[in-house]
Design a protein with these regions (language model features):
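Amphipathic alpha-helical segments that line or abut small-molecule/effector binding pockets
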Residues: 97-108, 184, 188
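NAD(P)-dependent short-chain dehydrogenase/reductase
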Residues: 44-91, 96-98, 104-105
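A hydrophobic C-terminal alpha-helical subdomain
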Residues: 153-175, 180, 190
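Mid/C-terminal beta-alpha module of Rossmann-like enzyme folds, strongest
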Residues: 102-103, 109-159
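Glycine-rich Rossmann NAD(P)(H)-binding loop
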Residues: 85-90, 120-127, 175
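Residue-level signal for the nucleotide or nucleotide-sugar donor/cofactor binding architecture
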Residues: 26, 33, 91-94, 128, ...
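Amphipathic terminal alpha-helices
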Residues: 183-197
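Catalytic helix-loop patch of NAD(P)-dependent Rossmann-fold dehydrogenases
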Residues: 2, 6, 14-56, 60-61
């Protein structure tokens, strides 16, 4: 910011409280946990810097690399007959590769026109529950494990998580031509990549 350089900041759906969505970029924030509060503080610092910037909120990221839900489900599905997965939290899983591509498009747009500063949302489509996402993973990987729906209350975590992580991404399409990726297509590619590894 001190050098007048534009920058891109990646944030999260956790800045919201999980009330029914999809959430728009300008909707009021209300994080439920420390992670969400620190990400919101990061957003506020970016805006206060005075530099040209884009804040990109995303959620439920998956990839053939690193630790993520898809890789966890593949591991569990290969080892168990049944997997209990939360069915009352919904979101739109985006592939990491699509996020990277969106970031490049946004960074170039901001470089050309610093007036493009703002906050945007990017996630996959269509919306899905964790349990249905797990079923899609089992189907795509041809794993026989059954997915049993459970409520989030039966899967305690150290931090509260939003029940509805859907993000409205229409602003990205209108302003930058960035379309939500279909996670089903990308899931097939990620699983094929992992099987070939």
């Amino acid at each position: 910011a001190d050098r007048g350089l534009p920058f891109l900041h990646v944030s999260t759906d956790y800045v919201f409280d999980g009330s029914p969505g999809p959430r728009h970029p300008g909707d009021p924030t209300a994080p439920l946990n420390a992670y969400g509060r620190t990400k919101l503080a990061g957003e506020q610092a970016v805006r206060a810097s005075g530099a040209a910037h884009v804040i990109l909120r995303t959620s439920w990221v998956f990839s053939a690399h690193g630790a993520n839900f898809v890789k966890t489900m593949l591991r569990l599905g290969a080892a168990r007959d049944e997997i209990a997965v939360v069915a009352d939290q919904i979101g739109g899983p985006p592939p990491a590769a699509a996020i990277a591509k969106a970031c490049l498009t946004l960074a170039e747009a901001l470089r050309r026109d610093p007036g493009k500063s703002g906050t945007h949302h990017f996630c996959g489509a269509p919306a899905v529950s964790w349990a249905d996402f797990a079923r899609a993973i089992m189907d795509q990987a041809a794993l026989p494990a059954r997915v049993r729906d459970i409520p989030a209350a039966d899967y305690p975590t150290p931090a509260r998580r939003p029940a509805d992580s859907r993000l409205d991404c229409s602003q990205l399409a209108t302003e930058f031509g960035i379309i939500q990726p279909d996670w089903r297509t990308h899931l097939a590619a990620v699983i094929a990549q992992l099987k070939g590894a």
